[in-house]
Design a protein with these regions (language model features):
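Structured beta-strand/loop patches that form or line metal/cofactor-binding pockets in enzymes
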Residues: 1-42, 51
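Metal- or metallocofactor-binding catalytic centers and their adjacent structured scaffolds
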Residues: 39-117
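Short, intrinsically disordered, charge-balanced linker/junction segments flanking boundaries
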Residues: 120-124
Length: 124
């Protein structure tokens, strides 16, 4: 089963205003994340999420830049694919911790595809 496409969609989910009486910290007003979708040639679509601790634009850009490395590859080789991503980002002198946030959504989407194909819930 080959990967045909990867999409990253930035989202911001508004939170209810904080009820704290503290004037120092009111808390965040939204949860920001990037939803990752991985598509296959057999019609499966895996969904993952990565926290956008780097900001929505950078997280989305890292996910989208993984597309040339992953498209056409067998999505069952999750460990190999993730290793390729990490090697590529190390070669480009990017801090691997930075990229690992974005890669978590890709890996989760790949495991989601494998769970769907096996007819099992993802947690198993």
């Amino acid at each position: 089963m080959k990967i045909t496409d990867i999409k990253a969609t930035p989202v911001a989910v508004p939170l209810k205003p904080s009820k704290t009486k503290s004037k120092m910290r009111k808390g965040p007003n939204a949860v920001i994340a990037v939803i990752v979708q991985v598509f296959t040639d057999e019609g499966y679509m895996g969904i993952g999420e990565t926290p956008a601790v780097l900001g929505l634009d950078l997280s989305s850009a890292i996910v989208n830049s993984a597309k040339p490395i992953l498209v056409g590859e067998d999505c069952a080789n999750i460990n190999l694919l993730m290793k390729r991503l990490y090697v590529q980002y190390n070669a480009n002198h990017l801090h691997i911790h930075t990229a690992s946030w974005a890669f978590s959504g890709i890996e989760l989407a790949l495991w989601d595809i494998m769970a769907q194909k096996a007819g099992m819930p993802l947690y198993q």
